[in-house]
Amino acid sequence: AVSRFTHIPGTQIVALCDYDPKRAEACQNILKKASMPKAAIYSGETGYEELCKRDDIDLVYIAADWLHHFPIAKCALENGKHVAIEVPSAMNLQECWDLVNLSETTRKHCFILENCCYDWFEMNTLNMAQNGVFGEVIRAQGAYIHNLSDFWDYYWKNGENDKLGWRLEFNMRHRGDVYATHGLGPV
């Protein structure tokens, strides 16, 4: 996620945050490779709160575990930051409305980074449809299947305090269909 921002001209990455300080520190290598200065590191359960209080941050990009997307976004908006959130942006309808209302109240942008709407395949298909390659499109259907078998070891929870094993539980609870926007968004 950090490497994406290093390719945007004029972007400065002044702070990084992860529950695990080693993971945040590892991102310094990405900045170094892009000839960017080191960023301040924040970590722990509430490290994002300190990051959001900084005056030199315009945008907080959130790529945390899903349960933390909303509280981090809320904190960032309340501290006058624009917010970009990987999907899902919230875990229930109330949190969605809270983000909408906070964004409107603070006059700060809050947007979902739905990569399955703007990735190469989706944009190529849109271009083909707009150029008549398929004729008149009268119906479309979307689906999303994500084979995560290569990542099961990473997603498996190794004890009660393991912060990285969160995703497998969501996949089991929701029949593996955890990204409704991935299949529906491009349609």
Where are these regions (language model features)?
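Predominantly a Rossmann-like dinucleotide-binding segment in NAD(P)-dependent oxidoreductases
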Residues: T106-F111, C116-V187
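A structured beta-alpha segment of the ubiquitous adenosine-cofactor-binding alpha/beta core
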Residues: A39-L59
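N-terminal Rossmann-like dinucleotide-binding module
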Residues: A1-A34
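Short, Asp-centered acidic motifs that coordinate Mg2+ and/or phosphate
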Residues: A15, L59, R139
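Beta-strand-loop-alpha-helix segment that lines the small-molecule cofactor/substrate pocket
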Residues: L59, D65-W66, F70-Y118, G132
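A short helix-to-beta-strand connector/capping loop
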Residues: K33-I41, T105-H109
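Acidic-histidine catalytic/liganding microenvironments
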Residues: F5-I8, R54, D119, N131
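Conserved hydrophobic residues forming the short capping helix/wall of the S-adenosyl-L-methionine
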Residues: Q28-K32, S103, A129
